[in-house]
Amino acid sequence: MKNPFECEVQDGKSLAASAKDALERVCSGKALDSLTRYYSPKFVDHVNGMKFQGLDGVRRSVELYTKILSDLDVVVKEQLTDSDRVTSRFVLSGKSFGKSVHINGITISRFQDGLIVEDWSVTDTLGMLRQLGVWRSALVGLRHWKFL
């Protein structure tokens, strides 16, 4: 019988490897069937002002990005670990409206019992709009609505 006061401790390298695999395999949509290997059922995703919860939330978040970018690819460029958290700098690549797009992003993943329980992510949305040639329209819209 397992001691209830004993917990499995993973080192920073294994947490970083899990975070990298989750981003490159699951978040790209290539291995959605393996999401339970990386994400807790209690998972909460805070991404670009949106919030997704649970394993279904992972699926919905990935579906959002795969609709925006066909042939989605996620490549982790750099990682930092601290205790139960891993920060990953990544690039999303794919096609949108027939144009190749590369979007920089950062995710901070918090682990519990070897699984990701929470992510905080931001991506360079303005950079994506510039690459698609629609950023001026976005700025006009923001001015119209008094955001600028």
Predicted regions and their residues:
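C-terminal and inter-domain tail/linker signature
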Residues: 1-148
